[in-house]
Structure formats: structure tokens, C-alpha cells
Regions:
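ADP-ribose/adenylate-binding Rossmann-like module
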Residues: 60-65, 71-96
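An accessory alpha-helical subdomain
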Residues: 113-189
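Alpha-helix C-terminal capping/helix-to-coil transition sites in glycosyltransferase folds
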Residues: 10, 56-57
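Glycine-rich, highly charged phosphate/nucleotide-binding loops
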Residues: 40-56, 64
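Glycine-rich, charge-decorated loop segments at or immediately adjacent to ligand/cofactor-binding or catalytic sites
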Residues: 94-104
């Protein structure tokens, strides 16, 4: 499997199961997808044809019930419908990594479904160790633009950006809210 960043704003998500796992998976899509619908067991059609029809109306299917056999049935129907599907109890055709978003910075960590707690731990360790990641992204973007006007060599520009990235003083300034790209650039050019 590979990581992709996907625009889901036009996609509809159907989640079977409204427990903790279903709620967590719904939260993953809630702010981005066109629609997120969660069904509890009592609201799920028992007739296979009706279930097939319901699944065909959605783009992404999540089987998040505590019943492995039911989840298998849902993912089989989703597969027959050529849908993206994920299961809480088996392998789907996509995974939901542990994610962090802030500004233009996004981080996704996965253990391919084998140890989700490890993925969450790594995500939390990185984001707590570097609280100014989003600010560094903003600074690097600004510096790239400024450097293109001052330094013709792409190799030299890349070296300067790496020096800034590895400068503990710059990270500290970013954490304190000081983002003066021109002043930082003067240190390196």
C-alpha cells in the first residue's frame, strides 16, 4: 500500500457501527467528506439486496462493527461494488493512518493496521517534539521564494534551506512566534 492525500469533498462515507471505532473513523472524514453516515446495527438492512443497494450509493465504506463476520460481509459487498472499503476486523483496500494536520503541515503514520497504538504514539512523539512544524513549513515556503530572487543555484538554495531547518535557534524563534524570514535569511546569505 502507498500513502495518498485525497480530496474527499465530493465523496460520501458510510460507516457500519457507531461504537468507539466507528466514531473515530467518522471523525477522520467528518470535516472533509461530502457526507458521513453512521449506521447502528438496528438500522442496517437485513436483506442482502437492500444492503447491496445501500452500499452502492456511497463511495467509501467502513465496516466498524464488533462482529467480524458482519464486517466481512460488508467488505465483500463493497468490493463487489468497486468501493473503497476499510474494516475494523480485517484488511480492506485502504487504511486510515494516524494523522496530524496543522496549517500546511500534515503527517501520516501507519503500521499497516498491525499496531495502531504504535502509529499514534509516533505521531504524538513527533508533533510534541517539534511544536513549530507548521511555522517551519511557512518559513521554508517564504524562504524558497526569497532565495529564488537572490541565489541562482538550486543546489545553494537547497543547502541554505537545510541549514535553516537544522538550526535550533530558528526552531526556538518559531516556537516563540518570531517568524521574520528576511532577518533569518540575512544570517545565511
Amino acid at each position: 500500500m502507498i500513502f495518498l492525500t485525497v480530496d474527499v469533498s465530493a465523496l460520501r462515507v458510510l460507516i457500519f457501527g457507531n461504537g468507539a471505532v466507528g466514531s473515530r473513523k467518522a471523525a477522520y472524514f467528518r470535516d472533509e467528506a461530502k457526507e458521513v453516515r453512521m449506521l447502528e446495527k438496528s438500522g442496517i438492512p437485513s436483506d442482502d439486496a437492500a444492503l447491496f443497494s445501500l452500499i452502492s450509493e456511497y463511495d467509501i465504506i467502513i465496516a466498524a462493527s464488533d462482529d467480524a463476520e458482519f464486517n466481512k460481509k460488508i467488505t465483500e459487498i463493497a468490493s463487489q461494488n468497486h468501493k473503497w472499503y476499510n474494516s475494523a476486523t480485517a484488511v480492506g483496500n485502504f487504511l486510515l493512518p494516524a494523522v496530524f494536520h496543522e496549517g500546511d503541515f500534515s503527517l501520516a503514520v501507519s503500521t499497516n493496521g498491525k499496531a495502531p497504538a504504535v502509529a499514534s504514539f509516533i505521531r504524538d512523539e513527533i508533533t510534541s517534539s517539534y511544536p513549530a512544524l507548521s511555522q517551519m513549513v511557512e518559513l521554508q515556503n517564504t524562504l524558497r521564494s526569497l532565495l529564488k530572487n537572490k541565489i541562482p543555484s538550486q543546489k545553494q538554495r537547497a543547502e541554505i534551506l537545510q541549514k535553516v531547518l537544522h538550526d535550533d535557534a530558528v526552531w526556538k524563534e518559531l516556537e516563540e512566534g518570531h517568524i521574520d524570514a528576511e532577518e533569518i535569511l540575512r544570517r545565511y546569505v
